[in-house]
Amino acid sequence: FSWTKNVHLPEGKFYGSAIYASKVNLTPSTPIYNEDGTYASGYRENNGYNPILEAEVNDYYARTVRAMGTAKIAYNVWDNLKVSSVFTVDYSLTKDFFFQSPDGRDGATYQGRGRMQMTDRIRYTSQNNLTYSKTFGKHSVSAVTAFEVMKYDYEDLYAAKKTYGQDINTSLGNAADPIDADQKLQEDALMS
């Protein structure tokens, strides 16, 4: 069993992200803060994006819960005949959330924008064997019959909203206008 939470910046997703573009465009002499302590903006480099402001007012995180388990049972039917079965489960639930604050450049156009994506995956596998093995002096006879069953379920749920109120609660329920919502379901099964 594992549970993780990653807090991250939107690196690697958009070329125009403030953090990525800052690596390329801003110089060490570009001010991050104004003399009064507020965040500086309006400079020509990087279209006025301030990477420290964006990192502070925006919220990006991913949570993952994962559980895996295996059980095995074996039974000797007769002296030379054995039945065995192995059952495994692999389950994961991932929730990705990002919030672009109306105080930052990315969220200002939307008066704040939030997106959440939840992905639910579960895989079951069952391996079943019937084994016969007999030795006659210097000779042996063995036979195995087996089958495996696998089932995989996948569900992805996505929603995005915009127009957050003055009291910033980053929950999607606090935004007024839906942007998009989608759901994807997939089921696969295999027997061999």
For each feature predicted by the language model, list its residue ranges.
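Surface-exposed loop/interface segments of Gram-negative outer-membrane beta-barrel transport/assembly proteins
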Residues: F1-R66, V86-M191
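Outer-membrane beta-barrel strand-turn architecture
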Residues: Y75-L81, K134-G137
